Amino acid sequence: NGRTVLIAPWICGLAQALSASLFYRAHKLNKESSLTNLAEKALNIFNYSIEDGGLKTTLNGYDFYEEYPTEPSTYVLDGSLFIALAFYDLYLETGNDSLFNSSCEGITNNIDYWNYKNQWSYYGNFGYLSSIQYHMLNTALLEVLFNLTNNMQIRKTIDKWKMFHNSVLKKLFIFIAYYYSNGKYTLLNRQELIRFIKRKILWTLLLLLLL
């Protein structure tokens, strides 16, 4: 909604990361060396800053790898987690763990950036909460990252973000906070709000009650 500038043609960090992970897994099946070369080329863009046409920026002094090379930065959590896992694939294949370590430092040292009242995740930089689908994805990806790093800050965050399962009141609180934050930060007029309500409120409430 006009809060960032994304200049075409632009590079998607998530697409680069998923492509690299796919190439590495395909290489394990057929041992074709050209696939690892493609994977490394896909990840090379993360060595360059957004200003230089790449996907690297900083968050509170730590390197951060973006899903979208925007100005200002979006800091989308799930995108950065997928990127970190692609860097882990790079490490397994080549032994080079510099990008993986750098991305983990950026995420773990800033994990409270995406933490809403120790109960839920923010989607990214602009003040609105993750949908329930993205929140569950964020939690699942953090579980994978914890299994790889054994970082207790990640473990504590996961445990906090799962606590909503235990309380109907917490589910109701998140339900209200989610729609308030999304309505406040992403919707520009009354018609958009009405469409948003019709499309998502009943579905989200049903999911929260079932979980």
Task: Give the ranges of each region predicted by the language model.
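Long, well-ordered core segments of solenoidal/helical folds
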Residues: 1, 36-58, 97-119, 153-176
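Carbohydrate-binding/catalytic loop surfaces
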Residues: 1-11, 56-78, 116-137, 141, ...
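Long alpha-helical, hydrophobic tracts
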Residues: 2, 67-70, 84-90, 94, ...
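Hydrophobic alpha-helical segments and helix pairs
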Residues: 2-45
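Well-ordered alpha-helical segments within folded domains of soluble proteins
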Residues: 10-28, 74-91, 130-147
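Hydrophobic/aromatic-lined pockets within catalytic cores
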Residues: 27-31, 47, 51, 91-95, ...
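Hydrophobic, aromatic-enriched interface-forming segments
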Residues: 42-54, 65-89
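Terminal, non-catalytic domain-edge segments
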Residues: 93, 131-211
